[in-house]
Amino acid sequence: MSSRGGKKKSTKTSRSAKAGVIFPVGRMLRYIKKGHPKYRIGVGAPVYMAAVLEYLTAEILELAGNAARDNKKGRVTPRHILLAVANDEELNQLLKGVTIASGGVLPNIHPELLAKKRGSKGKLEAIITPPPAKKAKSPSQKKPVAKKTGGKKGARKSKKKQGEVSKAASADSTTEGTPTDGFTVLSTKSLFLGQKLQVVQADIASIDSDAVVHPTNTDFYTGGEVGNTLEKKGGKEFVEAVLELRKKNGPLEVAGAAISAGHGLPAKFVIHCNSPVWGADKCEELLEKTVKNCLALADDRKLKSIAFPSIGSGRNGFPKQTAAQLILKAISSYFVSTMSSSIKTVYFMLFDSESIGIYVQEMAKLDAN
């Protein structure tokens, strides 16, 4: 009561405030009634609509902010919103027919064409092409044919033939790849932004990639399968580099990753990661985090290629199928969330037929678009 005996003026609480949302519930109700004048509209319909729109807006703004950050821009533009929508599968399906003003367009490049352009410059193609050329020159019957066609044409033909072989291998999921320097490319998959995933049958210590991944424990133990292989190939220099890293870094936490120089190895760097044990608390999330941390370290060094073993499926006890699914899921989501990545090729270095079959099968399930 006021001093004059009248009632206090009570401030009206809006429907949005009552529902706990920011978007205007009353306006949503008017929009729904305009479109459906013959139907009765429930009280909860505009509230639910406002909540959904608010959630979608926040999601798009978060992804657009990540795109602006990755492109080193301080302000979110319509272009970043377009990229955010295009790189999220659900949002892309929802807003497929929506035009974003001043957002530009996304080039519709077929993944195979993109892979050919990048593959001709990549290290893997450079490794694959020499052996067939040597085989073609070694027989006495094929030498005059090479002279007639010319060096450049012969090289182009050999590249085309090898491309057909690799495509057949990836399509049929067989072990008929292109054998080169002790390893065979069994299957290739291109992701949305052009990164290539390749299943390779070989020893991880023999591949000439920018980085190889070494699954270890908190003390940087090198007694596992991958650690033993790298230690034999790298020798004392590799062991000393690991010891120095252990002193500088200290114990390696679960899902953590640290990098050292690849002394004595074809690879430039070795990324040591501490993967979780199967059955531990949140082991699946931690395995995904382990893979993403390895990729982030490679991106920090501006590396273009990285080779993974089957992390977690050895002594840590992960089922091979589960480990493959989690690793591929982590890699795919990493490249979607990180708009600008220096990594162009990811190798999976496998040696047993069971792991090879699982990775080829799981890679075929990934959507290249």
Swiss-Prot record:
Keywords for this protein: Acetylation, Chromatin regulator, Chromosome, DNA-binding, Isopeptide bond, Methylation, Nucleosome core, Nucleus, Phosphoprotein, Ubl conjugation
Cross-link (Glycyl lysine isopeptide (Lys-Gly) (interchain with G-Cter in SUMO2)): K123, K167, K189, K320
Protein family: Belongs to the histone H2A family.
A GO term, aspect molecular function: rDNA binding
Distribution of this protein across tissues and organs: Widely expressed, with high levels in testis. Present in liver, kidney and adrenal gland (at protein level). In the liver, present in hepatocytes and at a lesser extent in cells of the bile ducts. In the kidney, expressed in proximal and distal convoluted tubules and in straight proximal tubules. In the adrenal gland, present in inner cells of the cortex and medulla.
Entry-annotated residues carrying N6,N6-dimethyllysine: K123
Main location as per UniProt: nucleus
Protein name: Core histone macro-H2A.1
Stretches with biased composition (Basic residues): 144-160
Any one GO biological process: negative regulation of gene expression, epigenetic
Histone H2A domain location: 2-117
Cell compartments where the protein resides: Nucleus; Chromosome
PANTHER family: HISTONE H2A
Domain Macro: 184-367
Record PTM Phosphoserine, positions in chain: S170, S173
Entry keyword Oxidoreductase: no
Positions where N6-lactoyllysine occurs in the chain: K7, K9
Binding annotation for a glycoprotein: D203, I204, V226, S275, G312, S313, G314, N316
